[in-house]
């Protein structure tokens, strides 16, 4: 006698079905059109093949191609079709792995001759053929012995290695599409035809097997896929726009920074770039002062014993740089390390003097330079480096102060992003992971506070911020908020964090004296707004396409003389601009004025003031804005007043205007 399962549908209805009924049969029982459109089903939040039997009760949803969750299936299936196409065209090629990644997928291949960009066109054409065949995806469960034998016969040595690494108690799933098959966890759609034609192979790169430089180098083909052609076109257009805005190219054109092979992941800041960086620090320093933070500075190099106590040496050592004096008889037991994080140093500063509950909250902030090892292949301009500056802060407070501190941090973060022109912000609360420190009651209490804070933020900033909860995504030492902002071309960047920490205060025995004269462990909050300041500056450069707001621009105004007769007048204007705090310089070179304008425009100078004999006689200038061919004639007094106001940062403008 068949057992039945009870299923709850999105509309709230419930119904019993046979235990062995498949997802496809269930969809067909609802409607033939739904079965035709279905690509998978979700049971209790887990996506499954339509061919899978139901097997258990719970919440069920039929996933169609229009469902956002189908996009991962489309890309996953596309990766399989890519592998089949490659082996049809280049039979000697071994396949390895092909996961879905953000905005697409890739597949790594082993062959003597790496693929070229020209090969991608041929492979893409073959993929369209395979999709057109509309072969069904079919799953089989193989024994480990059978899988090893068959993949060994096919000379798929990387697959054999993968099979050997799979735990003995885990099923080996094999997915067929026609005669071609691959080792895969699934799930997949019904057939290759459901992938559609909205895909494109993007680039070829080298990649070490399993990311280990000691292993063979493979060829990685990257691709992207979408549910429809319009989404694909929009994505490709965004990539074109992103290439134009690439901060690495703009950094060269604007003379901001450079990198060298003998300092991989280390930034050589030029004068203009460093000025822009200092503008960020000056802005944040004022904001911190307004919010009663104390700026501190902890050592760059600390003994290994401190990192062992903090736990970093145990779980983060591979990302740290050791610092050992270059002395022949130096004791190897005495090892120092460059700090990868600022938090242990801040705990030491907090502990240095006895604190009463009346002293709390203590808010310690630092523009702390940290060093973290990143593989050379992961380095990317300012976005991914080995040495960077964090606008880090750590708040030590009582349990009763936690909610207010989180709300204060949120106000600071959102107002900061608004000052830089970011209007679309999302906030995610990540809750307890499976592996964690602290009791369940401690987590319950902290999460209840954070959820209450989230609701307050939702109410206060209704329509201004998107919120969500990510179960199980918190750090092992406490729940956290993550702030993500959207830039001018629709890309999302995770920047700010507010992280509750149960771990470090206990490890370092940090305490304060409560009103009953008893020792109490403070609540510790890690807080960052920019995150990596270098990365945030890279985001700003790309967001503004180098057209920085006047208050952020490293070189705000250039006064360009048309002829040598106007040189003295140009110097006079420049001096007056500098006197009111503007960053200005004169261009008195014996060059044509159009050449000067073009050169300074390429360097993204926001304002060019052109002056000649006529301007000198009338005590005026011709103002030209970056990105515009229009020229506006103004008196020097009007010009100075206009630029002085515009060059004022938003926070200073607020303080003046009240």
Curated annotation (Swiss-Prot):
Annotated binding of Zn(2+), by residue: 343, 394, 526
Record function comment: Catalyzes the attachment of threonine to tRNA(Thr) in a two-step reaction: L-threonine is first activated by ATP to form Thr-AMP and then transferred to the acceptor end of tRNA(Thr). Also edits incorrectly charged L-seryl-tRNA(Thr).
Cofactor binding annotation: Binds 1 zinc ion per subunit.
Matches recorded under SMART domains: tRNA_SAD
Record keywords, A-Z: Aminoacyl-tRNA synthetase, ATP-binding, Cytoplasm, Ligase, Metal-binding, Nucleotide-binding, Protein biosynthesis, RNA-binding, tRNA-binding, Zinc
EC number(s) reported in the record: 6.1.1.3
Protein name: Threonine--tRNA ligase
Obligatory cofactor(s): Zn(2+)
């Amino acid at each position: 006698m068949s057992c039945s399962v009870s299923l709850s549908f999105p509309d709230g209805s419930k119904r019993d079905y046979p235990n062995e009924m498949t997802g496809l049969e269930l969809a067909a029982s609802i409607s033939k059109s739904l079965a035709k459109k279905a690509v998978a089903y979700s049971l209790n939040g887990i996506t499954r093949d339509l061919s899978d039997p139901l097997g258990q009760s719970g919440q069920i949803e039929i996933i169609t191609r229009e469902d956002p969750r189908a996009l991962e299936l489309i890309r996953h299936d596309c990766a399989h079709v890519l592998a089949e196409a490659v082996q049809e065209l280049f039979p000697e090629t071994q396949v390895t792995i092909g996961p879905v990644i953000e905005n697409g997928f890739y597949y790594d291949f082993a062959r003597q001759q790496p693929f070229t960009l020209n090969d991608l066109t041929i492979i893409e054409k073959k993929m369209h053929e395979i999709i057109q065949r509309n072969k069904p995806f079919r799953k089989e469960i193989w024994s480990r012995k059978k899988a090893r034998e068959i993949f060994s016969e096919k000379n798929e040595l990387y697959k054999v290695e993968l099979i050997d690494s799979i735990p003995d108690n885990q099923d080996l799933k094999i997915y067929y599409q026609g005669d071609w098959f691959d080792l895969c966890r699934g799930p997949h759609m019904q057939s290759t035809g459901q992938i559609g034609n909205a895909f494109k192979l993007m680039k070829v790169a080298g990649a070490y097997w399993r990311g280990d430089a000691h292993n063979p180098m493979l060829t990685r083909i990257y691709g992207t896929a979408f549910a429809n052609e319009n989404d694909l076109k929009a994505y490709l257009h965004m990539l074109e726009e992103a290439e134009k805005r690439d901060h690495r190219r703009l950094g060269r054109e604007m003379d901001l920074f450079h990198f060298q092979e003998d300092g991989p992941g280390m930034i050589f800041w030029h004068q203009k770039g460093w000025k822009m960086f200092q503008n960020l620090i000056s802005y944040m320093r004022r904001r911190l002062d307004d919010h009663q933070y104390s700026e501190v500075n902890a050592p760059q190099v600390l003994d290994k014993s401190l990192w062992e106590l903090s736990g970093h040496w145990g779980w983060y050592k591979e990302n740290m740089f050791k610092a050992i004096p270059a002395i022949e008889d130096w004791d190897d037991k005495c090892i120092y390390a460059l700090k990868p994080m600022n938090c242990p140093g801040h705990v030491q500063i907090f502990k240095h003097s006895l604190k009463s509950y009346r002293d709390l909250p203590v808010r310690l902030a630092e523009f702390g330079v940290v060093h973290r090892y990143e593989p050379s292949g992961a380095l990317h301009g300012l976005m991914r480096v080995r040495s960077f500056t964090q606008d880090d802060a750590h708040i030590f407070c009582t349990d009763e102060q936690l909610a207010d501190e989180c709300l204060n941090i949120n106000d600071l973060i959102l107002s900061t992003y608004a000052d830089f022109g970011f209007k679309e912000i999302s906030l995610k609360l990540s809750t307890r992971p499976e592996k964690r420190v602290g009791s369940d009651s401690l987590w319950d209490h902290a999460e209840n506070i954070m959820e209450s804070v989230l609701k307050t933020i939702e109410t206060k900033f209704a329509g201004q911020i998107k919120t969500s909860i990510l179960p199980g995504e918190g750090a092992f030492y406490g729940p956290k908020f993550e702030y993500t902002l959207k830039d001018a071309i629709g890309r999302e960047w995770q920047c700010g964090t507010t992280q509750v920490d149960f771990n470090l205060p206990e490890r370092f025995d940090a305490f304060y004296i409560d009103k009953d004269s008893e020792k109490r462990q403070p609540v510790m909050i890690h807080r960052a707004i920019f995150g990596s300041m270098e990365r945030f500056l890279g985001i700003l450069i790309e967001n503004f396409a180098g057209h920085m707001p006047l208050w952020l621009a490293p070189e705000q105004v250039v006064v360009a003389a048309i002829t040598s007769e106007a040189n003295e007048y140009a110097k006079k204007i420049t001096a007056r601009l500098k006197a009111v705090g503007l960053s200005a310089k004169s261009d008195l070179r014996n060059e044509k004025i159009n050449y000067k304008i073009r050169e300074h425009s390429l360097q993204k100078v926001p304002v060019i003031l052109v002056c000649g004999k006529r301007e000198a006689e009338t005590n005026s200038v011709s103002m030209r804005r970056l990105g515009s061919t229009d020229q506006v004639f103004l008196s020097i007094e009007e010009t100075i007043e206009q630029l002085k106001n515009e060059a004022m940062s938003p926070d200073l403008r607020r303080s003046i205007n009240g």
